[in-house]
Amino acid sequence: MSTKDLFAEPNLKQITVWARGVVMNKDARDIVVALTEAAAKEGKYVQAWENYVDLPDRIYVPVRAYARISSDPIESKYIYENETPDIVVLVEESLIKGVPILKGIRPGSTLVVNTKRSIDTILEFLGDTGNLAQIVTVDANSMAEAVMTLSGAEGATDATGIGAGIAAPIAGAVVKATGIVDVENLAAVVKNPAAMRRGYAEAQVRQLPPHEAVEEAAVSATELLRQMPFAGTVPSPVTENEGMVTGNWRIQRPIIDREACTECYTCWIYCPDSCITRTEEGPVFNMKYCKGCGLCTAVCPSGALTNVPELDFKD
């Protein structure tokens, strides 16, 4: 039996929350915990956990947290990932670029994005919406200030409580669009119910036209090996790993003003990822691997570099 067969539970709802490593792990965790705590108050069966198999937990790397909610006992509780999510949540808007956020979604699924941009803009980056039935946007950053705490290390119970930062309004937007739990039960478990209610009230929801689902073709792994130049061998990259493109960790990118640049190459010296090349035209940035750390902008003595939000660019 495949894992997809294990997930054939009609009353099970799967929620996948995408966030950025280290700096946003807690927000993703708070969202899934808030939703499952609210569901538990309604007598439902729940699970909430985080995924550490994507990539090493580094700053800005795409990471996931999961929730499962059902009115029946969850039979597939030992499956580590949500392979067919019903609800996908993006804690940070640039995750819509270069990250397979819609992989495996079920027909009728919902996408919730924390952004101040329009739904039309989000659709431009999505391209094929697949099985999505609705898109939701909520400007959670303007609704609740992030709370800093010294209460403990990563993974510890945080004294600020569930949903103290942007998680509360995002969770409110999820409930508005899906009704997965009662909004009053959600208000009872978040630290900032006012922010949650604002997210619930102000979230923008758009229904999408029906999309004919496309069944994934089942391909034998053995057959794929036989199609390679030499059966049984796996080609390895010579100069770079195409599967490890770190540019999708970026939430902002450096933009250079050539007129202001003095070609001192201080940025080239300080770049921790060797993404800057010295050329006759001045510094050139490799956006395929630039993580948008902002160090080059910080050390530029002439102010020729500016950090610009990643979603301002279509490439």
Swiss-Prot record:
pH-activity note: Optimum pH is 8.7.
Domain of life, source organism: Bacteria
GO molecular-function term, one example from the UniProt record: 4 iron, 4 sulfur cluster binding
InterPro entries documented for this protein: 4Fe4S_Fe-S-bd (IPR017896), 4Fe4S_Fe_S_CS (IPR017900), OxalOxred_delta (IPR054933), PorD_KorD (IPR011898), Pyrv/ketoisovalerate_OxRed_cat (IPR019752), Pyrv_flavodox_OxRed_cen (IPR002869)
Domain 4Fe-4S ferredoxin-type: 252-280, 281-310
PROSITE patterns, sorted: 4FE4S_FER_1 (PS00198), 4FE4S_FER_2 (PS51379)
Pfam families named among the record's database cross-references: Fer4 (PF00037), POR (PF01558)
Catalytic activity: oxidized 2[4Fe-4S]-[ferredoxin] + oxalate = reduced 2[4Fe-4S]-[ferredoxin] + 2 CO2
Cofactor(s), names only, from the UniProt record: [4Fe-4S] cluster
Record note on cofactor: Binds 2 [4Fe-4S] clusters per subunit.
Binding site for [4Fe-4S] cluster 2: C271, C290, C293, C296
GO biological process, one term: oxalate catabolic process
Binding site for [4Fe-4S] cluster 1: C261, C264, C267, C300
Keywords: 4Fe-4S, Iron, Iron-sulfur, Metal-binding, Oxidoreductase, Repeat
Task of the protein: Catalyzes the anaerobic oxidation of oxalate using a broad range of electron acceptors, including ferredoxin and the nickel-dependent carbon monoxide dehydrogenase. Does not require coenzyme A as cosubstrate. Enables anaerobic growth on oxalate which is used as energy source by the bacteria.
Name of this protein: Oxalate oxidoreductase subunit delta
Organism: Moorella thermoacetica (strain ATCC 39073 / JCM 9320)
Lineage, uppermost ranks: Bacteria, Bacillati, Bacillota, Clostridia, Moorellales
